[in-house]
Curated annotation (Swiss-Prot):
This is 4-hydroxy-tetrahydrodipicolinate reductase. It is found in: Cytoplasm. GO terms for molecular function: 4-hydroxy-tetrahydrodipicolinate reductase; NAD binding; NADP binding; oxidoreductase activity, acting on CH or CH2 groups, NAD or NADP as acceptor. Pathway: Amino-acid biosynthesis; L-lysine biosynthesis via DAP pathway; (S)-tetrahydrodipicolinate from L-aspartate: step 4/4. GO terms for cellular component: cytosol. SUPFAM superfamilies: Glyceraldehyde-3-phosphate dehydrogenase-like, C-terminal domain (SSF55347), NAD(P)-binding Rossmann-fold domains (SSF51735). GO terms for biological process: diaminopimelate biosynthetic process; lysine biosynthetic process via diaminopimelate. Catalyzes the conversion of 4-hydroxy-tetrahydrodipicolinate (HTPA) to tetrahydrodipicolinate. Coiled coil: none annotated. The keyword Transmembrane does not apply. (S)-2,3,4,5-tetrahydrodipicolinate binds at H153, G162, T163. It is an enzyme of class 1 (oxidoreductase).
Length: 263
């Protein structure tokens, strides 16, 4: 498959480029940066042996290169518009950018289906993180008192993380509604109890040195249960990205969540 990478200078995009180069059945045909200084990726020392054009305009890249799939790891500000542009050009998309609303996902799914092409948006491409979400969903049926703590590097732009939101959405499907905390609790400092989704509290930590981590903490009388996943390196996401790129060939719709393509 001929693959282009959008956001290739970001930490995740850089790792995706290296992954595409490692995979025998994937070919890196173009990369995209919002303000490129280079015309070819070989102007970067690490990739000096390659011949891959660098683009600053997504539509131009799609029309000139015609990739089979674009992997997008950019920012919430442009993630939706990028994905829409990719799909409207009839190109498959694998998107790790977060911040999509349910309405945006629905619209993008309609475009993918009208074009009969596959696409996948996932808040997390680590298989361990997907298992964490599935385990939490099962546990929430029996432990409705639950809070989420997500921890990421301090350059992450959105909060709470897409993984935390997806976890809460999945737990809400099996969990009896409980508004977490005392009915008359008072925040002495605004935001001390975190954000709220369906009565569950979500807390976001941003610190240097972290990559991506999440704890789902359940409490009940006389017992507690904690489900935690840690990504210590961005390589943890790459097997999921490569799997998703290949899977788009089999799809004619947009899938939200890596768990929906795992056997």
């Amino acid at each position: 498959m001929r693959v282009a990478v959008s956001g290739f200078k970001g930490r995740m995009g850089h790792e995706v480029v290296k992954t595409v180069l490692r995979e025998a059945d994937l070919e890196l045909v173009a990369v995209l940066d919002h303000e490129p200084k280079e015309k070819n990726i070989n102007e970067i020392v690490e990739f000096s042996s390659l011949d891959v054009p660098v683009f600053g305009n997504l539509s131009e890249m799609l029309e000139e290169i015609k990739p089979d799939c674009v992997v997008d790891f950019t920012t919430p500000k442009v993630g939706y518009s990028n994905t829409k542009t990719i799909l409207e050009h009839g190109v498959r998309a694998v998107v790790g950018t977060t911040g999509f609303t349910p309405e945006q996902i629905s619209e993008l799914r309609s475009i993918a289906e009208s074009k009969k092409i596959g696409a996948l948006i996932a808040p997390n491409f680590a298989v361990g993180a997907v298992l964490m979400m599935q385990f939490a969903q099962k546990a929430a049926k029996y432990f409705p008192n639950v809070e989420i703590i997500e921890l990421h590097h301090d350059n992450k732009l959105d909060a709470p993380s897409g993984t935390a939101v997806k976890t809460a959405e999945m737990m809400a499907e099996t969990r009896e509604f409980v508004k977490q905390g005392a009915a008359d609790e008072v925040e002495l400092i605004e935001g001390a109890r975190g954000s709220e989704y369906e009565g569950m509290r979500i807390h976001s930590v941003r610190l240097p040195g972290l990559v991506a981590h999440q704890e789902v903490i359940f409490g009940a009388e006389g017992q507690g249960l904690t489900i935690r996943h840690d990504s210590y390196d961005r390589i943890s996401f790459m097997s999921g990205v490569a799997l998703s790129v290949r899977k788009t060939k089999e799809l004619e719709t947009l899938i939200y969540g890596l768990e929906n393509i795992l056997d």
